Design a protein with these regions (language model features):
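DUTPase catalytic domain/fold
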Residues: 1-129
Length: 129
């Protein structure tokens, strides 16, 4: 685990790249705060059948993403509905040569019942926002 000072050094020498990083992102002792973007997608299936994941993926690949609803988060914020899955991305783009970044939600979010799931980070044309 790197300290915030070491993260800053690695950014300065180019080993870690963080595009659009906020000025105060490294204020904690051993982390870099990331922000969610202003667009999210709501997964509109009431029940997600894990045996059917290939069909969900096929819909995305065939541009038939009827189960995803695009929502722009207004300046005033957005009230999240319970029992929904929301997909979004960070404002920042993080790349690194030699480190494996770990992303966790803040304790405050966990206390509210919100969990953060990190995916592989591969870019897809379906979610360019």
């Amino acid at each position: 685990m790197l300290t915030s000072n070491e993260i800053r050094k690695q950014i300065d020498n180019g080993t870690i790249q963080i595009e659009n990083m906020a000025e105060d992102a490294l204020k904690k002792p051993n982390s870099c705060d990331l922000r969610i973007g202003n667009v999210l997608y709501v997964f509109d299936y009431e029940i997600v059948d894990t045996k059917n994941c290939k069909n969900y993926l096929q819909e995305v690949l065939n541009d038939q993403i009827s189960h995803l609803r695009r929502v722009v988060i207004p300046e005033t914020g957005l009230l999240l509905e319970p029992h929904k899955v929301y997909l979004t991305k960070t404002v920042e783009k993080v790349t690194t040569n030699g480190y494996v970044p770990v992303m966790n939600g803040k304790t405050m979010l966990s206390l509210l019942g919100v969990s953060v799931e990190l995916t592989n980070g591969y870019k897809t044309d379906h979610f360019d926002d």
